[in-house]
Design a protein with these regions (language model features):
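Active-site pocket-lining/capping segments in soluble small-molecule metabolic enzymes
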Residues: 1-45, 63-68, 72-155, 162-571
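Short, conserved phosphate-binding/catalytic loop or strand-edge motifs used
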Residues: 49
C-alpha cells in the first residue's frame, strides 16, 4: 500500500512528502528519487547536527521541533543549508513531538502515528488538588513572522490535520494578510488578522518557546485549556433541551461542545433549534437565558461547561463538489505508468527479501543502570551488558574508577540523552571523544543528531534505542545504512508486527525492551509548583511521576512496562 501511495505521489509531482518513519525515507530514496523529502517534526530534529544529517540523506526541508527558541533557530540556519520549516499556529503538545507515549499507554492508540487520545487534556490531581497540568495553550506566532523570517525560516506550518476547512481558511487568511502586508501597514494587518483568528475558537494563545526557553502561559493548571469560547454552564435539562445563560452571542448554525466536569471527552453538535422562553429563536445576545436542543450523542449533566467551537461557515464547497473538482485534474494513466513500473520493481525486491531466513539469534540480556556503582550487576548470571546514562556525574565517576572499569569496557553501553539543545551537543561531543579515548566503544543513540557525535572516531559500535521508532524492516535497514549495529524496536509495537519483523532477514540484531519504567512524556515545559519526584494522579487513580533533569521534564508511569510474561513467546 505504501509503495502504491509513493508511486501515485511521484506521478502527480507533489511539492514534497513529509516523512517520519525512516523506512519511508529508504523506499522513497531508492525507488522514487524524484520525490522531494521533508522531515517531519515527529523526527525530533532540534539541533544543527540533526539538520546536517538530513542534508546528507537527501532531504530538502526540515520541520524543526516546536521547542526551539528564535536564537536556536538562528544558530541552526547559520550552520545548515536546507529549507527550514516551523510551526506558527495550532495546538501545542506538552511532550516534544515524537517523544510521547502517553496516548498509547492509556488507550493503545499511538499519538506518534496520528491516533492521539489526548490524555494530556484531562484532569490530574497533585496533593489532592485537581488541575490540568499537561494541557497546553495554543501556539500563535503571527506577530513573530518577521522575526522567524530573519531567523531563517522559509516555510510556516499551520496545524490542519483533523481541522475543518473553515478553521484552515480563517487561519491561513489571517497569516497571509500579515505576511503580505508592507512594513508600514503591519500593525493594522495584525489587528485585522487578530479579529479573524478570534473566530477560529482556539484555546488561550502562547508564543511557545520562540521568545525564550521558559515560555510564559504555555500551561496553566487552573485553566482547563479546552478548545473553544466558554459560553456558560448547564443549569437545566428538560425534554432534551440544555439550558444556560450565554455570555456571548449564539446563533443557529453555531457548533457547541459540552465538556463534563471530570476528565472525560466532551460531546459536540451543531445548534439546529433553540428557545428563548418558549419561543423558537435564531439568535440570542450575551446575558440571555436560552435552551438548546441537545443533538449530541453523549450524556450531559448539570454543571457541565458549554463551549462554542465553530460559527457561521465561510467555506461552503461540499465534499462531493471537492471530489468532482479533484477528478477533473487527475493525471491521465499514461503519465502515471513510469512510477507504476518503479512500484512493481520495488515490490519484487521487497518480496524477494522476505523469502530469506532470518535465523535464530542467541539470547543476550542488557540491564539499565544509573551509575558506576551498578557495575556489580554485571556479576549477575545471564547479564551480558550494562547500559548507563551518559551524564556529567557518571563522567566524573569514570575518572575516579579507572581500575574498576578497566576490564568492563567491552560490556558497558553509554546512553546518549535523547535531546541535545544548542551548546549541549558540543559538550557531549567532547564527552564521547573522552570515553572513546579511554577505550569505550558502545553507545546507545536515540536521534539522527546523535550520529555525528562519533564522526572521525574508529571502532565505534552504535546501537539504536526504542526512541528510534523501529516498526518495520525498512526502518531497521535505514538505521543500519546510517551506521547502527543494533536496534531496540519501538515499545509501541504489537505482537503481530513483532513476529513479522523478527522473521525478516536483517544485517543487524534487534532487541526488545522486556521490563523497565514506562516513559510517558518528555518535555521542555517546566511544571511550576511541582517538585521532581512528585506523583500526579488521574481521576482513575493512574499515577505518573514527574522528574526534572537537564532542563527537561520527564513523566514516568507508576506501573512499569513489562513483557516478562511473554519472554518465551518472544524467544
Amino acid at each position: 500500500k505504501l509503495i502504491d501511495i509513493l508511486a501515485d505521489l511521484s506521478s502527480i509531482g507533489v511539492d514534497g512528502i513529509i516523512i517520519q518513519d525512516l523506512g519511508v525515507w529508504r523506499l522513497a530514496r531508492t525507488w522514487f528519487p524524484a520525490l522531494p523529502l521533508h522531515a517531519s517534526t515527529q523526527m525530533t530534529v532540534h539541533n544543527s547536527a540533526g539538520v546536517r544529517m538530513l542534508e546528507q540523506m537527501g532531504f530538502v526541508r526540515a520541520v524543526l521541533a516546536r521547542e526551539l527558541s528564535l536564537a536556536e533557530i538562528t544558530e541552526i540556519r547559520r550552520e545548515t543549508s536546507i529549507e527550514l520549516e516551523h510551526f506558527v499556529h495550532g495546538a501545542l503538545c506538552f511532550s516534544i513531538s515524537g517523544q510521547c507515549f502517553f496516548s498509547s499507554t492509556v488507550s493503545g492508540m499511538s499519538g506518534n502515528r496520528g491516533r492521539c487520545a489526548q490524555p494530556c487534556r484531562r484532569r490530574y490531581h497533585h496533593r489532592g488538588e485537581p488541575g490540568y497540568h499537561f494541557s497546553t495553550s495554543d501556539l500563535c506566532a503571527i506577530d513573530l513572522l518577521p522575526d522567524l523570517i530573519k531567523a531563517g525560516i522559509t516555510s510556516f506550518k499551520i496545524e490542519g490535520r483533523m481541522k475543518s476547512a473553515e478553521y484552515v481558511a480563517r487561519v491561513v487568511a489571517a497569516y497571509r494578510l500579515v505576511l503580505d502586508a508592507p512594513a508600514r501597514e503591519r500593525k493594522e494587518a495584525l489587528r485585522a488578522a487578530g479579529e479573524e483568528l478570534a473566530l477560529s475558537f482556539g484555546r488561550p494563545a502562547t508564543r511557545g518557546f520562540l521568545t525564550g526557553f521558559v515560555p510564559a502561559g504555555i500551561a496553566t493548571p487552573s485553566q482547563q485549556g479546552t478548545l473553544g469560547q466558554h459560553l456558560g454552564d448547564v443549569v437545566s435539562l428538560r425534554q432534551g433541551l440544555i439550558g444556560l445563560t450565554v455570555n456571548d452571542r449564539l446563533h443557529v448554525g453555531d457548533r457547541l461542545r459540552i465538556q463534563p466536569q471530570n476528565d472525560q471527552a466532551g460531546t459536540g453538535f451543531t445548534v439546529r433549534e433553540m428557545l428563548a422562553g418558549e419561543k423558537p429563536v435564531r439568535a440570542v445576545k450575551a446575558g440571555e437565558f436560552v435552551r438548546v436542543r441537545n443533538a449530541g450523542k453523549g450524556s450531559v449533566h448539570i454543571g457541565d461547561a458549554v463551549f462554542k467551537v465553530g460559527g457561521k461557515p465561510r467555506f461552503t464547497m461540499s465534499s462531493e463538489a471537492c471530489q468532482k473538482r479533484l477528478a477533473e485534474i487527475a493525471l491521465p494513466e499514461g503519465r502515471r505508468q513510469p512510477a507504476r513500473d518503479r512500484a512493481v520493481q520495488a515490490l519484487v525486491a521487497l518480496l524477494a527479501a522476505r523469502t530469506g531466513n532470518a535465523g535464530t539469534a542467541a539470547d543476550s540480556l542488557t540491564v539499565q543502570g544509573r551509575g558506576i556503582s551498578d557495575c556489580k550487576l554485571l556479576g549477575q548470571p545471564g547479564v551480558e551488558r550494562l547500559q548507563l546514562p551518559l551524564t556529567p556525574e557518571n563522567l566524573l565517576e569514570v575518572k575516579k574508577n579507572e581500575r574498576l572499569l578497566a576490564g568492563l569496557k567491552e560490556r558497558l553501553i553509554w546512553e546518549i540523552p535523547p535531546m541535545l539543545f544548542g551548546a549541549q551537543w558540543q559538550e557531549y561531543r567532547r564527552a564521547v571523544q573522552m570515553l572513546a579515548g579511554q577505550g569505550f566503544h558502545a553507545f546507545r543513540v536515540a536521534n539522527l543528531g546523535h550520529i555525528p557525535l562519533f564522526a572521525g572516531l574508529k571502532d565505534m559500535k552504535l546501537m539504536g534505542g526504542f526512541r528510534c521508532s523501529v516498526l518495520n524492516s525498512q526502518a531497521a535497514l535505514a538505521w543500519h545504512e546510517l551506521g547502527l549495529a543494533q536496534l531496540v524496536v519501538s515499545i509501541e509495537d504489537d505482537r503481530r508486527n513483532l513476529a513479522e519483523l523478527f522473521r525478516r532477514p536483517l544485517p543487524l540484531p534487534l532487541a526488545v525492551t522486556v521490563y523497565g519504567p514506562l516513559p510517558v512524556l518528555l518535555s521542555r515545559v517546566p511544571m511550576r509548583g511541582i517538585r521532581s519526584g512528585a506523583v500526579l494522579r488521574s481521576d482513575k487513580e493512574e499515577g505518573y511521576r514527574v522528574l526534572t533533569h537537564a532542563g527537561l521534564t520527564e513523566v514516568i508511569g507508576e506501573q512499569d512496562f513489562s513483557l516478562l510474561g511473554h519472554v518465551r513467546e518472544l524467544r
